[in-house]
């Protein structure tokens, strides 16, 4: 109504409000919403201005913690500009699931990979890819969890893949949970066990 009564100059000064389109949503243990969106400028990803994953409070403010060495954007490098490469470009998340320990995983549709982060925004691991081998996907459309297991729905394969963590993965979960619970000595011991299995693991 006000726009009808406004002058051309006044309308030009009014900011247009375009709501963000979210393509999936998950509820965490504290009642906050984790959401994913593919509506962003890819040039703003590395600076952190674009937020493809968000944790929203009751008034819609993003309160996702990003204290890791990089932003929560999935792949940190990708082919830019005009390219004929299949599955090129930045990660585009289609779903998110939040475990009871506040660790969350997101499904990337560009490269068919899963990225898992702790509550501080540290990348714990990334895996997957395009293909029909074990651990790879053709067209992942949904991600869910049951305990520590991740369940991926692939619409092209017409199947649900259940991904169970290895002993190494369970140790990473355990060390992360202990650290966030304030059990620093116990967490350090568990991280040492992680280091025995992977001496290049940055968080350990």
List each language-model region with its residue ranges:
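Eukaryotic scaffold repeat domains enriched in small/polar residues
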Residues: 1-203
């Amino acid at each position: 109504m006000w726009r009808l009564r406004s002058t051309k100059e006044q309308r030009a000064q009014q900011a247009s409000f375009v709501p963000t389109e979210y393509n999936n949503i998950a509820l965490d243990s504290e009642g906050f919403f984790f959401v994913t969106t593919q509506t962003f400028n890819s040039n703003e990803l590395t600076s952190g201005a674009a937020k493809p994953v968000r944790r929203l409070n009751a008034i819609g403010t993003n309160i996702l913690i990003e204290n890791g060495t990089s932003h929560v954007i999935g792949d940190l490098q990708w082919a830019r500009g005009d390219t004929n490469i299949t599955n090129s470009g930045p990660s585009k998340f289609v779903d998110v699931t939040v475990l009871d320990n506040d660790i969350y995983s997101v499904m990337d549709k560009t490269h068919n990979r899963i990225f898992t982060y702790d509550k501080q925004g540290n990348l714990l691991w990334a895996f997957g890819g395009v293909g029909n081998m074990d651990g790879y996907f053709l067209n992942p459309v949904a991600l869910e969890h049951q305990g520590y297991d991740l369940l991926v729905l692939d619409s092209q394969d017409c199947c649900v893949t259940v991904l169970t963590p290895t002993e190494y993965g369970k140790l990473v979960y355990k060390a992360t949970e202990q650290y966030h619970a304030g059990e620093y000595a116990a967490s350090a011991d568990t991280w040492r066990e992680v280091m025995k299995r992977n001496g290049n693991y940055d968080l350990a």
